Swiss-Prot record:
Other remarks in the entry: According to PubMed:14761999, can complement an E.coli mutT mutant. According to PubMed:15576788, cannot complement an E.coli mutT mutant.
Entry's pH dependence statement: Optimum pH is 8.5-9.
Protein name per the record: Putative 8-oxo-dGTP diphosphatase YtkD
Organism: Bacillus subtilis (strain 168)
Pfam families in the cross-refs: NUDIX (PF00293)
Amino acid sequence: MYEFKDYYQNTVQLSFDDQPFSDSPKHVWVICRFGGKWLLTEHEDRGYEFPGGKVEPMECAEEAALREVKEETGARVKSLKYLGQYKVLGKEKVIVKNIYFADIEKLEKQADYFETKGPVLFHELPENLSRNKKFSFIMKDSVLPISLKKLKESGWIE
């Protein structure tokens, strides 16, 4: 297990075990690849980030992950794999979030991308991402680099 501080100095615990913090997490975050590129969305307030959000009532985390990717990017997921889970010990509440890796089959244009401006493709993620004001705070802690390392070790990405 990994432990570190997030952008707002909250303690974050990250594990690649099978749902170590909750078997019914209320949030999801989906690292997406499409045609050898990273698929992100541009949140209207936060900036660039991988798709994600809340698990709705009567919905499991996997269903939420598929829905959020579709809503925020218009993408159809070819395969979705559970990667890990993290817990943010916030000042007011605790958030548990599943991390998934999605291989995207295709992007479809939509009239509405909900609270985002739609899909954004990156050949490479910037090295100075933690200091880049165009990126969301969600992308600026250690969850992303540790998750990318795990994806490479697992052979899911090159």
